[in-house]
Amino acid sequence: MMMASKDATSSVDGASGAGQLVPEVNASDPLAMDPVAGSSTAVATAGQVNPIDPWIINNFVQAPQGEFTISPNNTPGDVLFDLSLGPHLNPFLLHLSQMYNGWVGNMRVRIMLAGNAFTAGKIIVSCIPPGFGSHNLTIAQATLFPHVIADVRTLDPIEVPLEDVRNVLFHNNDRNQQTMRLVCMLYTPLRTGGGTGDSFVVAGRVMTCPSPDFNFLFLVPPTVEQKTRPFTLPNLPLSSLSNSRAPLPISSMGISPDNVQSVQFQNGRCTLDGRLVGTTPVSLSHVAKIRGTSNGTVINLTELDGTPFHPFEGPAPIGFPDLGGCDWHINMTQFGHSSQTQYDVDTTPDTFVPHLGSIQANGIGSGNYVGVLSWISPPSHPSGSQVDLWKIPNYGSSITEATHLAPSVYPPGFGEVLVFFMSKMPGPGAYNLPCLLPQEYISHLASEQAPTVGEAALLHYVDPDTGRNLGEFKAYPDGFLTCVPNGASSGPQQLPINGVFVFVSWVSRFYQLKPVGTASSARGRLGLRR
């Protein structure tokens, strides 16, 4: 079978014009694999086998997290997708699996590449049996298993049988059993035919359908249906959102490989399923606030609602400022008094131990106080130090586990950088305060608590006035965003802050993002119009 358009013109010598650009390979024959017994071996023990609608067996549909891209940033050996055999590979089977306790059988997989004649490169698709780890797989090891090597210019779908190799009679839905895995890796890097210019990004999709021997076992008694909340983000422009480390409006979005790419902020930390981490509060009114009782020397911290703070249960009370590398200037109000007084807090001495529930404020008297961070200045100790808002203060213990600090985050994807939301922090210098998520996103996620059903959420940053997609972003379950900077520009990239982040779909963590500024237009009316 010619991997070229059938209506392409022929040259003088009779060769197909498209065939001169597209490699001639034969993908009509399926990958040679010995057949594996399907549901027949489970009939004797299951007592019942429930056949599937023929339409589902005869039609390929896109697998959840079945989108992938190949870009010039990828290198040979990079994993493009890693999928395991199971009902979750097909949306219809995933829906039906909720009605049964077990499943058994093989599946058929088609890989479709949206390549072109201007970019060349090869991928290798391997079927990895259970028991072999796919995380540290090399290209050489991948060729040991049933595999197919295809050019990204291939026009016809690549069909691969995914056999149910197992050491049990059938699989239980409530057990995490190892199954056959389909792993796709970059075999040779992308390159252009002319030798100059950047290669195009090649997109691909994974389509699946069950084999005729795929069946479900053991019907589950019906229960009251519970509606699952879909994952969403606030439909608000970035210019109307607030910083989650200080009560300040967002002034810009920081996209630059020059920024710090591993941070451990304790405020502004929330997982995509709504779990608060560190000292993050739900409400903006609790951000960068302190409450406690002073004896004239130290302030014994309490929670903002007045309940006692229990040392060793967290790094500090909820909402406690997490700005390190600076001195704090806090406007304090004593309960029972109408006046407000500003006190200075040095975050470097040994008396600063919020993990143990106490800090020291210069010149404060006895009483019950509540305060909010007003502005910052360079740290008093050591003398001559500069403000560094990428750091967090020393909470009073060098043992991370003892203080229950929120873990550090870093960009896990190929060529990705962390996305920071910046605000102008008051002080004697031009200080940009970064945070990982706007506070309104944290309130929304904590309220919705929508389950994460993928390894990353694909987001589009859309201009609500024009509908143009300004860039692709990924939101990871730990609660941070990443993107791929445009290599054509140097230094930090600036995007307008009137855009809206829109959830598109769940994707694999291997999904390769398009560089910022190269995405296509978005569809539909999204965001608020101003």
Swiss-Prot record:
Chain segments carrying region Protruding domain: 226-530
Span of the signal peptide: none
Any single Gene Ontology cellular-component annotation: T=3 icosahedral viral capsid
InterPro entries for this protein: Calicivirus_coat, Calicivirus_coat_C, Rhv-like, Viral_coat
A matching Pfam family: Calici_coat
An MF annotation (GO) of this entry: identical protein binding
Keyword Membrane among UniProt keywords: no
Region (Disordered): 1-20
Source organism superkingdom: Viruses
Positions of the UniProt region annotated as Plays a role in binding to host histo-blood group structures antigens and in the formation of P-particles: 523-530
Region entry P1 sub-domain 1, spans: 226-278
Swiss-Prot/TrEMBL keywords: Capsid protein, Host cytoplasm, T=3 icosahedral capsid protein, Virion
Region (P1 sub-domain 2): 406-530
Family statement drawn from the similarity comment of this UniProt entry: Belongs to the caliciviridae capsid protein family.
Protein known as: Capsid protein VP1
Protein source organism: Norovirus (strain Human/NoV/United States/Norwalk/1968/GI) (Hu/NV/NV/1968/US)
Lineage: Viruses, Riboviria, Orthornavirae, Pisuviricota, Pisoniviricetes
